[in-house]
């Protein structure tokens, strides 16, 4: 499909720079693709009223790490070249893939020292060697530390990797360390938040429990590749980024039991959906799963296991707007987004939410 079919105009003032407070006070646009789309303006706290006892919410419990690193490249006696790196995938205890800016300043064998911007590494200096250069500014780094020691050092010197559309307008701060994290995050490794989950609070969970709604957790470590623009003119020519995740055997079995009883699988966020669909067989049976997924969902995809999707509002021509268009219909989503813009919904990671029913 032509990528420009997924384009739309978004006013700059529609982009949220801070989340709603409290988290569960955000708005929620309910979208039912029944012929002419049925759109309903509600709030996140209304979510339980759209679910039935025995339905299951699926959450991504990945935890965002401060993966934005500011460093200085040194090559021989040249130690004056600043570089910015966003870690996006761990490939070994001491090795990470990262996006570098400006990547042209780096080559294999260069050393980078981190923690010179006012943040001190408690374990001493944090350094890495550039092992490889890839496409689109990607590099592979081998750090001098490994495992938990490296994790502690990154925590000390790193910054929360805010999405580009926020970072271009303001610097990260201490509030973001809490705001850009779900209340149920536990598996460290993401460099972007599963943002639909940011709306959940203990109050909302209590209401869901009262309604007999089940909840389960899977893990997909969201990478910085989620923000990469689609540069191809046709979706068939786009190469999707990969992310690491897993669905454990107990969770897979319980989700299958929900489906067998007639309950619906409701994914909180596109990351949960992509992982569940990666784990699902053709018949919808959800299998235990672990590894890297590069699933790219566009209109025409047949959803195997997911019945409903709660998700924030996405960028024009992004792979995530393509995904929601596959789920609820391209015309439906264009109508929904036009309504959201006209009625003042807040967009993107810190913005409002939508609840989508799957198109038959």
Swiss-Prot record:
Pfam families referenced in this protein's UniProt entry, alphabetically: Queuosine_synth
Keyword field: Cytoplasm, Queuosine biosynthesis, S-adenosyl-L-methionine, Transferase
EC number per UniProt: 2.4.99.17
GO molecular-function terms, A-Z: S-adenosylmethionine:tRNA ribosyltransferase-isomerase activity
Top-level EC class as recorded in UniProt: transferase
UniProt superkingdom: Bacteria
GO biological process: queuosine biosynthetic process; tRNA wobble guanine modification
Any one cellular-component term (Gene Ontology): cytoplasm
Cell compartments where the protein resides: Cytoplasm
Record pathway: tRNA modification; tRNA-queuosine biosynthesis
InterPro entries reported for this sequence: QueA (IPR003699), QueA_dom1 (IPR042118), QueA_dom2 (IPR042119), QueA_sf (IPR036100)
Gene3D superfamilies linked to this entry: QueA-like
Catalytic reaction annotation: 7-aminomethyl-7-carbaguanosine(34) in tRNA + S-adenosyl-L-methionine = epoxyqueuosine(34) in tRNA + adenine + L-methionine + 2 H(+)
PANTHER family in UniProt: S-ADENOSYLMETHIONINE:TRNA RIBOSYLTRANSFERASE-ISOMERASE
Function noted in UniProt: Transfers and isomerizes the ribose moiety from AdoMet to the 7-aminomethyl group of 7-deazaguanine (preQ1-tRNA) to give epoxyqueuosine (oQ-tRNA).
Subunit structure: Monomer.
Protein name: S-adenosylmethionine:tRNA ribosyltransferase-isomerase
Underlying gene: queA
């Amino acid at each position: 499909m032509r990528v420009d079919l997924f384009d739309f105009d978004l006013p700059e003032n529609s982009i949220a720079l801070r989340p709603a407070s409290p988290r569960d006070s955000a708005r929620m646009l309910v979208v039912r693709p029944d012929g002419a789309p049925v759109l309903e303006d509600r709030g996140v706290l209304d979510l339980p009223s759209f679910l039935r006892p025995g339905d299951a919410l699926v959450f991504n419990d990945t935890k965002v790490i401060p993966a934005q690193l500011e460093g200085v490249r040194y090559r021989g006696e040249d130690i004056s070249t600043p570089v910015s790196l966003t870690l996006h995938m761990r490939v070994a205890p001491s090795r990470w893939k990262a996006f570098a800016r400006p990547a042209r300043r780096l080559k294999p064998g260069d050393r980078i020292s981190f923690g010179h911007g006012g943040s001190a590494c408690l374990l001493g200096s944090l350094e890495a060697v550039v092992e490889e250069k890839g496409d689109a500014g990607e590099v592979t780094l081998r750090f001098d530390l490994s495992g938990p020691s490296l994790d502690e050092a990154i925590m000390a010197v790193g910054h929360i990797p805010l999405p580009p559309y926020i970072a271009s307008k303001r610097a990260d701060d201490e509030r973001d360390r809490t705001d850009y994290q779900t209340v149920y995050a536990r598996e460290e490794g993401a460099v972007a938040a599963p943002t639909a989950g940011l709306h959940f609070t203990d109050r909302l969970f209590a209401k869901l429990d009262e309604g007999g709604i089940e909840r389960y957790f899977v893990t997909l470590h969201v990478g910085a590749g989620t923000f990469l623009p689609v540069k191809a003119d046709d979706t068939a020519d786009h190469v999707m980024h990969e992310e690491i995740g897993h669905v454990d055997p107990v969770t897979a079995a319980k989700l299958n039991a929900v489906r067998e009883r007639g309950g619906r699988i409701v994914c909180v966020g596109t990351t949960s959906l992509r992982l569940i669909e990666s784990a699902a067989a053709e018949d919808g049976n959800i299998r235990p799963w672990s590894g890297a997924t590069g699933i790219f969902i566009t209109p025409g995809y047949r959803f195997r296991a997911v019945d409903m999707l709660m998700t924030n509002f996405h960028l024009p021509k992004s792979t995530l707007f393509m995904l929601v268009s596959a789920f609820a219909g391209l015309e439906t989503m264009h109508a929904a987004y036009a309504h959201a813009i006209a009625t003042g919904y807040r967009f993107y990671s810190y913005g409002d939410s939508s609840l989508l029913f799957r198109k038959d």
